[in-house]
């Protein structure tokens, strides 16, 4: 059986931790930031985790992580 390929788009966006959780960064933080207040931009800096079926799907795309 051939090697499974890693989905490169998913590899750039997600990180699978030792615990099995899938870490991701938040959207809406790249441009058009002048009208967003400081509190909102500060909250967007923090990473968050995928839950349930979403995490399972991403883990399937990243077989060697």
Swiss-Prot record:
GO terms for cellular component: cytosolic large ribosomal subunit. InterPro entries: Ribosomal_bL35, Ribosomal_bL35-like, Ribosomal_bL35_CS, Ribosomal_bL35_sf. It holds the Pfam family Ribosomal_L35p. Gene3D superfamilies: 4.10.410.60. Transmembrane segments: none annotated. GO terms for molecular function: structural constituent of ribosome. One of its GO terms (biological process) is translation. Keywords: Ribonucleoprotein, Ribosomal protein. Belongs to the bacterial ribosomal protein bL35 family. This is Large ribosomal subunit protein bL35. It comes from Thermoanaerobacter sp. (strain X514).
